[in-house]
Regions:
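FIC/Doc superfamily catalytic core
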Residues: 1-250
């Protein structure tokens, strides 16, 4: 199984190296209906402008975003502890978990400054997110990496030599695509996780970039806790990713 994963990665990586190749995906009627329904809800939220007026609500939601995104990655801090860390209070917890919160808060606070089409900004975001936590902070991994469930390999990341070109192609597609932002964000999220470009922090950065793409469409997405939904439906989230892996489509 391990060898088969690598063979499939080599084949798919070679295919995606072609210039201007779009990620493989189909837009079904169900997807179009969901885009329409979400668009209707987004319009109502935008009209209220609640996030722009209520700074307390924005901060509370940002804390929920950080708590959920890190909890998905097995960070042990509670929502209350995350709040205390962000507010500069002393928390008795593993230093690694505290540092993850501090790093995540720093980059989410700079979300509006990031260019969603910039690989340089992607690397900067990763550098901040993983500062003092991993050796290859702020750069693409140089070694093979996979995602494991216990001892079971559930996803093998793209071979390191393919990563720069694949990420470049993905960002070119993101910049030039005329698809709806909801579709672009979802496709990017999956393709990014499939490539698995970093030693660690791929999930956190993937969710960050998903929010970034949507925030360039509607500003309030910068404070909307999408990560909390991912945490709540984590099982379904991974099932969807695995189904895309099997189908070979975003």
């Amino acid at each position: 199984t391990y060898t088969l994963f690598w063979k499939l990665q080599i084949i798919r990586g070679a295919i995606l190296m072609k210039k201007e190749l779009s990620p493989p995906f189909k837009i079904t009627n169900d997807i179009l209906n969901l885009v329409y329904e979400i668009g209707e809800l987004v319009g109502k939220i935008s009209a209220e402008k609640e996030f722009e007026k209520n700074l307390t609500l924005r901060k509370e939601n940002r804390i929920k975003i950080i708590y959920s995104s890190l909890a998905i990655e097995q960070n042990t801090l509670t929502l209350e502890q995350v709040t205390d860390v962000i507010n500069g209070k002393r928390v008795l917890a593993p230093l690694k978990d505290i540092k993850e919160v501090q790093n995540a808060y720093e980059i989410y606070e700079r979300l509006e400054e990031l260019n969603e089409n910039s690989i340089e900004d992607l690397l900067l975001a990763h550098k901040i997110m993983t500062s003092e936590l991993i050796k290859e902070s702020g750069r693409f991994r140089s070694k093979n990496a996979g995602v494991y469930q216990g001892e079971k390999l559930i996803h093998m990341g793209t071979l390191p030599e393919y990563i720069p070109e694949l990420i470049n192609n993905l960002f070119l597609w993101l910049k030039n695509s005329k698809e709806h932002p909801l579709i672009k964000a979802a496709v990017f999220h999956y393709e990014f996780e499939f490539i698995h470009p970093f030693q660690d922090g791929n999930g956190r950065i993937g969710r960050l970039w998903h929010s970034l793409i949507l925030s360039k469409w509607k500003k309030f997405f910068a404070w909307l806790p999408i990560e909390s939904l991912v945490q709540k439906y984590q099982k379904e989230y991974y099932i969807a990713i695995n189904n895309s892996n099997k189908d070979g489509e975003s």
